[in-house]
Each structure stands twice: as structure tokens, then as C-alpha cells.
């Protein structure tokens, strides 16, 4: 395979793209990026996105995985125009329901001489390669191309059943990749390949191009790992066009690998690859989609944060970079934080509630089912917490102390380390000053003024040493919402109980 001059073709007028995952595991970020880029291209061009399922692997496919794929697309807001649950003129849209179609196409390819019966076993292919002085892994050698009827009959008499192979032409195969420019595969570099197993099961090498052809897909956007299969599909497309099954050759674009830590390809087994891990940690759809879009594409050289509406206005797959993209979880979290800050406060709270309920902080998993007090506290806390969290999973740690009516909160280990020798004396002075404040005056500004006077101006403590013990008493955490606002939300009785509780435990 060689890259020639950088030639990227024009897109067709009526773009038809597809997303066609196999239901063989939990949705991963590479799969979702593929869906995102296809969706963005369809929306940017006013084209059509087809969603179908490639479920012909009876051993690995599962209905659970199928449902997870649907769940992930719906959560992310990636919609489609034709296919699963939507219907359309080219159904069915699950390969397991299209077996008769594949058998019919395979029979036509065989009858036309584009495919042939192959009786060779893997062991025989390996032995022939070794005998000819070729590496054992050289691949299929074309042995069965010209078998006579007598030879075929003899194999059948032995009980052998043939696979079907496509005849690859003895010529260079080149195409203009939408992302990589012109790519050329030299003659002889791609052997004749199997499209139907001896047991009659059609393979991906047949089903995928046949579905694309019959669904009139004209732009194929997929991962770099499938680049090596493109010359096979180009040849098969030529044959399908000759047979009147395909209308045209689609354009191909191969998106770059997503790399993980240590510059290795991100594996499906890596936690960072698991889409639902990111959702469980508190990524919001806007933040995660924004970051996935950056794995190969950018809206502008000096801009990383954008909405999906902005993406679909600007996206062109020909702008995707061919170089591998590295999944940087820190950058992903940073971008997610930006999108959290852009949410309306009520939207932020409603999205946070399932995480709060999961972590045992509130009584229900949806906003409308919360108690009046929970809604009141969260509404007051939103402007304090929303600018400070990066993931919705962090909200519980920030608001738990505000929702709790406990008098003493056991400090976390990192919070305890912040307490200096002066903590006891600081708490004594703080308690004395705050006990003199009327509940009617228990307001943020007055609390700040009272403690600042007692601890900094009169006590002589630096602000960090003055307010640190009070913060630990109020939240039990090293990082918490703003102190005086928190004290106002919690109220005088609970605030004093917490200060006294920590003082007693020192």
C-alpha cells in the first residue's frame, strides 16, 4: 500500500452515509466517534444517515450489546434518518434478517465467474506456500481458481464443501481517500478472498459491501483498521455494478486510530474506551461529543469548545487529519467542565440528580420527586457548585454537606492534613463569634464580616489558617463550595453543631 499525491475527491450532492456496528460488546469511544463523524457529515450536507446492525456472528453477537448501542446513540442525541427502529426503503436493517439476499448475490457472483469454489484447507495453503519457498503466512495462492469439474467432484466425494472466493485482478488498485488522499495497492498484494464459508455462512467481506450497494451508500466513513479491506471491496463493487446490484462506487474515508496511554492503540478493554464509564463518571453528552470530535477534527486552530450545532455547520470529513489521535482524559474532562458551566442552572440540577441519588445524597433519582427541602438546598447551591465541578459525578461531594443535617462530619484524610496546631483555638474563637449572630442576620456577607473580624483582624491569623478549620468543619472536605454561602444554606444550628463537633474531636 502506498500513499500517492494528496488528492481528495468532491463529495456527492446527496450524501448517504451509514453507521453499521456489530453488537459484540459495550459501546466504545472509537465506535461512537465513527457514528459522530457520519452523523455530522449527514447533517452538514443535508444528507442521509443510515443505521444498520451487522449481527452475523452468532457466537459473539448479543441482544444486550445491541440494546446498549441504541441506548448510547439516544443518550448522545445522535439520530438517524433510515434504518433500525426508523425503517426505510432498503430494509431489513439487521444483517441476520438478510441471509437470503446474501445467498442470492453470492450465487450471481459465482454464475458470472467473479467468484469461484475453493476447497483448499488452511493447512493445505500453508503447506503449498512452504513447498514453494514462500512464508507459511503468505496467504492464499489461487490454487482453486482453475479446478476442473472432475477435481471439484473428487473433493465433494471426500465430503468437502467449498468456500466461495472472489477473483482479484492482477493489477494495481488505487482510490482517492477522503481523508488520506490517493492510496494505491500493488498488484498481487491482496489475494483472492473468501466471501462465503464452506458451511454457507456469508462473511463481512460480502455482507458489508452488498448492504452498502443495496442501500445506495455513496460515502463510506470508517476506521483506519478497515483500510486494508478497501481494495477487496472496490473489486467486489465493480462486479456488483456489472451485475446491476450496485449503482456506483462509493467514496471511502478512513478515520485515524484513537490511541491510548503509552501511544498504544486504545483497546476495547481499556476503561477509557468504555462509553458508559464516562457517562457513569459524569460526562454530559455535549462535553463528550465535543471531545470525541477533536479526535481527528477541529472547528478552528485556536478553539476546542463548541456545540454540536456549530460542528454540523462546519464539518467536512475531508478536513479530518490522518494522523493518529490520542485520547487524553484530562483534556476530555476539562472540555466537559466548560460544557457543564454553559448549562442553565435548572438543567444542571436535573442532570445531577441521578448521580446524587446513586451516591445516597438525595431521596429520589429525578428532580420532581425530591423533597421541598432538597430542591431548595440544591437551587441555592447550584451557583456555588456548577462553576466548580468538572463531572456530574463530583456534585455529590460538593453538595452532600449542604443537604445533610448532621452536626459532626468526619473529615476526609486529606482535609485532616490541612488542620494545623492552631485549629482548636481558631474554632473556639469562631464559635464564640458566631453564637452572637442572630439567625435573622445569618447571611453570607455578615458571616464573612463576623469571622474575618474575629479571626483575622482581632485573632491575627492569616486567612488560610483562619478559615481552613471552619471549612473542614462545615464540609468534611478539603475542597468544598464557598464557605460563607454554605453556612447560610446550612443554617445557624447545624453550622455551630459542626464547628463544635470538630472541636471536640481534635
UniProtKB/Swiss-Prot annotation:
Which amino acid positions bind ATP, per UniProt? 268
- UniProt function note: Catalyzes the attachment of glutamate to tRNA(Glu) in a two-step reaction: glutamate is first activated by ATP to form Glu-AMP and then transferred to the acceptor end of tRNA(Glu).
User: InterPro entries annotated for this entry?
Assistant: aa-tRNA-synth_I_cd-bd, aa-tRNA-synth_I_codon-bd_sub2, aa_tRNA-synth_I_cd-bd_sf, Glu-tRNA-ligase_bac/mito, Glu-tRNA-synth_I_codon-bd_sub1, Glu/Gln-tRNA-synth, Glu/Gln-tRNA-synth_Ib_cat-dom, Glu_tRNA_lig_a-bdl
The record's similarity note reads: Belongs to the class-I aminoacyl-tRNA synthetase family. Glutamate--tRNA ligase type 1 subfamily.
Reaction(s) catalysed by this chain, per the record, are: tRNA(Glu) + L-glutamate + ATP = L-glutamyl-tRNA(Glu) + AMP + diphosphate
Recall the GO molecular function terms of this protein's record.
ATP binding; glutamate-tRNA ligase activity; tRNA binding; zinc ion binding
What is the designated name of this protein? Glutamate--tRNA ligase
Where in the cell is the protein located?
Cytoplasm
This protein's source sits in the domain of life called Bacteria
List the ranges annotated as motif 'HIGH' region. Answer: 21-31
Looking at the UniProt record for this protein, which Gene Ontology cellular component terms does it annotate, in alphabetical order?
A: cytosol
Sorted UniProt keywords: Aminoacyl-tRNA synthetase, ATP-binding, Cytoplasm, Ligase, Nucleotide-binding, Protein biosynthesis
Q: Which Gene Ontology BP annotations are present?
A: glutamyl-tRNA aminoacylation
Q: Kindly give the NCBIfam families that the UniProt entry links to this protein.
A: gltX_bact
The record's EC number reads: 6.1.1.17
CDD domains, alphabetized: GluRS_core (cd00808)
Q: Where is the motif 'KMSKS' region annotated in this sequence? A: 265-269
Gene3D superfamilies for the chain: 1.10.10.350, Glutamate-tRNA synthetase, class I, anticodon-binding domain 1, Glutamyl-trna Synthetase, Domain 2, Glutamyl-tRNA Synthetase, Domain 3, HUPs
The subunit structure is: Monomer.
Amino acid at each position: 500500500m502506498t500513499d500517492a499525491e494528496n488528492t481528495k475527491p468532491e463529495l456527492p450532492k446527496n450524501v448517504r452515509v451509514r453507521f453499521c456496528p456489530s453488537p459484540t460488546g459495550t459501546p466504545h469511544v472509537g465506535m461512537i466517534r465513527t457514528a459522530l463523524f457520519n452523523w455530522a457529515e449527514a447533517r452538514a450536507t443535508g444528507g442521509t444517515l443510515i443505521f444498520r446492525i451487522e449481527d452475523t456472528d452468532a457466537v459473539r453477537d448479543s441482544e444486550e450489546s445491541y440494546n446498549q448501542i441504541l441506548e448510547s446513540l439516544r443518550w448522545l442525541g445522535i439520530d438517524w434518518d433510515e434504518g433500525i427502529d426508523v425503517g426505510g426503503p432498503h430494509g431489513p436493517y439487521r444483517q441476520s434478517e438478510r441471509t437470503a439476499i446474501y445467498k442470492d448475490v453470492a450465487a450471481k457472483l459465482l454464475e458470472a465467474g467473479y467468484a469461484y469454489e475453493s476447497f483448499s484447507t488452511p493447512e493445505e495453503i500453508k503447506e503449498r506456500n512452504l513447498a514453494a519457498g514462500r512464508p507459511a503466512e503468505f496467504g492464499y495462492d489461487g490454487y482453486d481458481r482453475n479446478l476442473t469439474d472432475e477435481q471439484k467432484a473428487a473433493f465433494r466425494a471426500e465430503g468437502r464443501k467449498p468456500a466461495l472466493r472472489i477473483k482479484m485482478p492482477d493489477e494495481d488498485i488505487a482510490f482517492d481517500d477522503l481523508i488520506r488522499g490517493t492510496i494505491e495497492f500493488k498488484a498481487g498484494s491482496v489475494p483472492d478472498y473468501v466471501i462465503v464459508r464452506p458451511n454457507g455462512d456469508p462473511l463481512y467481506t460480502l455482507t458489508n459491501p452488498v448492504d452498502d450497494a443495496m442501500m445506495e451508500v455513496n460515502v463510506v466513513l470508517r476506521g483506519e483498521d478497515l483500510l486494508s479491506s478497501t481494495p477487496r471491496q472496490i473489486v467486489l463493487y465493480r462486479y456488483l455494478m456489472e451485475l446491476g446490484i450496485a449503482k456506483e462506487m462509493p467514496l471511502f474515508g478512513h478515520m485515524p486510530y484513537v490511541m491510548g496511554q503509552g501511544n498504544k492503540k486504545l483497546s476495547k478493554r481499556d476503561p477509557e474506551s468504555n462509553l458508559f464509564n464516562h457517562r457513569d463518571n459524569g460526562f454530559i453528552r455535549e462535553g463528550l461529543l465535543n471531545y470525541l470530535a477533536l479526535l481527528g477534527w477541529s472547528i478552528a486552530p485556536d478553539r476546542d469548545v463548541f456545540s454540536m450545532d456549530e460542528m454540523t455547520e462546519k464539518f467536512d470529513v475531508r478536513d479530518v487529519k490522518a494522523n493518529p489521535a490520542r485520547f487524553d482524559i484530562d483534556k476530555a474532562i476539562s472540555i466537559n467542565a466548560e460544557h457543564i458551566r454553559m448549562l442553565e442552572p435548572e438543567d444542571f440540577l436535573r442532570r445531577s440528580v441521578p448521580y446524587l441519588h446513586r451516591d445516597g445524597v438525595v431521596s429520589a433519582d429525578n428532580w420532581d420527586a425530591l423533597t421541598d427541602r432538597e430542591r431548595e438546598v440544591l437551587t441555592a447551591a447550584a451557583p456555588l457548585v456548577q462553576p466548580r465541578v468538572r463531572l456530574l459525578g463530583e456534585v455529590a461531594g460538593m453538595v452532600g454537606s449542604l443537604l445533610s443535617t448532621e452536626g459532626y462530619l468526619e473529615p476526609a484524610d486529606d482535609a485532616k492534613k490541612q488542620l494545623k496546631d492552631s485549629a482548636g483555638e481558631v474554632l473556639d474563637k469562631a464559635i464564640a463569634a458566631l453564637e452572637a449572630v442572630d439567625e435573622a442576620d445569618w447571611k453570607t456577607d455578615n458571616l464573612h464580616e463576623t469571622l474575618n473580624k474575629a479571626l483575622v483582624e482581632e485573632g491575627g491569623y492569616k486567612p488560610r489558617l483562619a478559615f481552613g478549620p471552619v471549612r473542614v468543619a462545615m464540609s468534611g472536605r478539603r475542597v468544598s463550595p464557598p464557605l460563607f454561602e454554605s453556612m447560610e444554606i446550612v443554617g445557624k444550628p447545624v453550622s455551630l453543631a459542626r464547628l463544635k463537633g470538630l472541636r471536640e474531636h481534635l
